[in-house]
């Protein structure tokens, strides 16, 4: 299993609108690609020097091949959906391999 982690720092001026868009539109659209099993959105408890509010969104995917398929088939379109917020956030993405999971 893999996690596609997207960490986003959002300017406070658009925070509420962006958060609603993420929860009601973007994350559901990501799941509808069929490449991810679930999504977990967390607020990062950190005071950024640059300001803003930081979130981590973790999308679980079964394997690296599925994640590669997402990059090839869906990533460009999904990232373009954030155009209304352009210049008001920064994001970086990491791939995590799950080595152990317990409940």
Model-derived regions, located:
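Short, well-ordered beta-strand segments in beta-rich or mixed alpha/beta enzyme
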Residues: 3-9, 42-73
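A short, structured loop/turn motif at beta-sheet edges
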Residues: 31-33, 62, 103
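Short amphipathic alpha-helical segments
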Residues: 15-40, 79-80
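Glycine-rich beta-strand-turn "strand-cap" elements at beta-sheet edges
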Residues: 40-50, 80-103
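Short N-terminal helix-initiation segments at or just after the protein's N-terminus
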Residues: 1-7, 35-42, 77-86
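A generic structural signal for alpha-helix starts
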Residues: 12-17, 65
